[in-house]
Amino acid sequence: MPRSQINGNFIDKTFSIVANILLRIIPTTSGEKEAFTYYRDGMSAQSEGNYAEALQNYYEAMRLEIDPYDRSYILYNIGLIHTSNGEHTKALEYYFRALERNPFLPQAFNNMAVICHYRGEQAIRQGDSEIAEAWFDQAAEYWKQAIALTPGNYIEAQNWLKITRRFE
């Protein structure tokens, strides 16, 4: 039984019902429908913290999905899982791959900035201020890109950029 049919969360059930209706009425190929089913099941597993299952579904969705825009969201969600698992290098790779396919994902830029900022803080704790500054500069660049895409969002990042004099 597909995960979407056993999910107990009301919002997930509602999403699944709407998604199934849309899949029936919007003209799509069977491959696209199957890719979306895996993507949907991946999101469901991810929301429940079942990251291994989510990754399996996302990888299968990637195998089937041909649209670069849709692939960008699959890659982004894989990046989220790696971030949650503390696998920051892998997460950065997947966010970057998502942005290659869809450069209008401010949340990917934001997450990349958060990882870089975190690494900057780690470098400070290790006493390496030069490396820390490099990480902070990279975080600033990613936050600037996120803010450029959605100027009203990322207020804390905007404040950090101003306080650290990295905002132009």
UniProtKB/Swiss-Prot annotation:
Provide this UniProt record's keywords sorted from A to Z: Chloroplast, Membrane, Photosynthesis, Plastid, Repeat, Thylakoid, TPR repeat
What Gene Ontology cellular-component terms does the record carry? chloroplast thylakoid membrane
TPR repeats (start-end): 35-68, 72-105, 120-153
Which cellular compartments is it found in?
A: Plastid, Chloroplast thylakoid membrane
Q: Which Pfam families match?
A: TPR_1
Which region is the signal sequence?
Answer: none
Entry annotated with the keyword Chloroplast: yes
Question: What superkingdom heads the lineage?
Answer: Eukaryota
The membrane topology of this protein is: Peripheral membrane protein
Which example biological process does GO assign this protein?
photosynthesis
For this protein, the record's HAMAP family field holds: Ycf3
Q: What does this protein do?
A: Essential for the assembly of the photosystem I (PSI) complex. May act as a chaperone-like factor to guide the assembly of the PSI subunits.
Give the family this protein belongs to, as stated in its UniProt record: Belongs to the Ycf3 family.
Q: Which PANTHER family match?
A: CELLULOSE SYNTHASE OPERON PROTEIN C, TPR REPEAT-CONTAINING PROTEIN MJ0263
Please report the name of this protein according to its UniProt entry: Photosystem I assembly protein Ycf3
Give the organism's phylogenetic lineage. Answer: Eukaryota, Viridiplantae, Streptophyta, Embryophyta, Tracheophyta
